[in-house]
Amino acid sequence: MMKAGRFGMSRKFKTPCFIMDKRRLEENLEKLSNIEKESGVKILHSIKSFNKSSILPHIALKLSGMSIGSKRELNMAQKANAKHLHLHAPAFKEEELLLMLDEVSTISFNSLGQWERFSTIASKASMGLRINPNLHLPIPSYCNPNLEYSRLGIGYLEFLESYKKNSNLFRNLDGLHFHALFQSSAQGLMVLLEHIEQHYGEILPKLRWINLGGGHNFTDNEYDVKSFVQLLQKFKSTYSHIELYFEPGESVVKRCGDFITTVLDIVPVAEQNVVILDTSIETHLLDVAIVNQRLKVKGTQSSSTPYFYELTGNTCLQGDIIGEYFFIDKLNIGDSVVFEDMMGYSMVKMTEFNGMENAEFILV
């Protein structure tokens, strides 16, 4: 149990739990809404990053729509009364796609094969293609969609060659989708727009929309909104007919809440203090398991202290290790360990490995 004094409350919460600060969420949504107004673009919330049904309707009120990848996410977005719905997945089953086509606003197919199979189906959806621009950007390989061997999107040279050979194949092409950035500043957008203007001059006049994807660090305190607006104004001065969409993942819930755990035991192993928490990398912190992500822990520092602990989970998996940290104060059984900035890409990945329960979500 932990007392949420840091959130200005006195009641206790059962751990593990995710606690969201609604004031910070509102600040992020207000900033994103202002970016929409200043730049004239439409920002879509990516449900894959955060999908709590109690919060989605409020997000839908503030932003222009949602980005989805499946029938289940479509249902979530519709229940939240989201306006514009953009659909994209690496591949679609025909029977599932037919159920969604008339329910979404825009769709991006991921390959030429899927385009050839499905783009001629009569529907209300505006059809597009996801392109891999093969940009050379400093992005971790596990989430870099620009890699030459990435399965995400058609390589831009392959697309341009196909268009040149048979432009009639793309007669229904309304939009292009570029998801090429990761936690990027406005500089990343500049690189992407330069690529688009350099390579698609023949195609741009015929398009209705471009989806510039996620990876834009909009709600970071250092994000240069002025430069962002200027870049888009320059692009729109030439291509005013093209609607621009962005679908940030983390930006909506960045710095909006933490994950709270409790120390169950402290075990001395080979002259090291191993802390067992009421969580697991397999159940609540899956990105630690998948990509060896290092989490931010409240009350720790990078330099040495007398209180050095290895934080671990409470499952039978030997590799259930969160990481090693220098704490400012000594830990005791029953203490809270707080993982900071944990709203994005966490709850959507929870499992029940080893019988562990899902962590509760609390809005304060």
Q: Residue ranges of each PLM-predicted region?
A:
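N-terminal capping/small domains of soluble enzymes
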Residues: 2-82, 87-96, 280, 327-340, ...
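Feature marks short, surface-exposed loop/turn motifs that line or immediately flank catalytic pockets
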Residues: 135-137, 182, 218, 252, ...
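Structural alpha-helical segments in enzyme catalytic/regulatory domains
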Residues: 231-239
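Active-site-proximal beta-alpha core segment in soluble small-molecule metabolic enzymes
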Residues: 41-209, 234
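Glycine-rich beta-strand-to-loop/alpha-helix junction loops that act as flexible
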Residues: 179-181, 210-219, 248-250
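Charged helix-capping and loop-helix junction motifs
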Residues: 190-196, 224-231, 261, 326
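Charged (often Lys/Glu-rich) extended helix/loop segments that serve as interaction or gating elements
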Residues: 231, 243-364
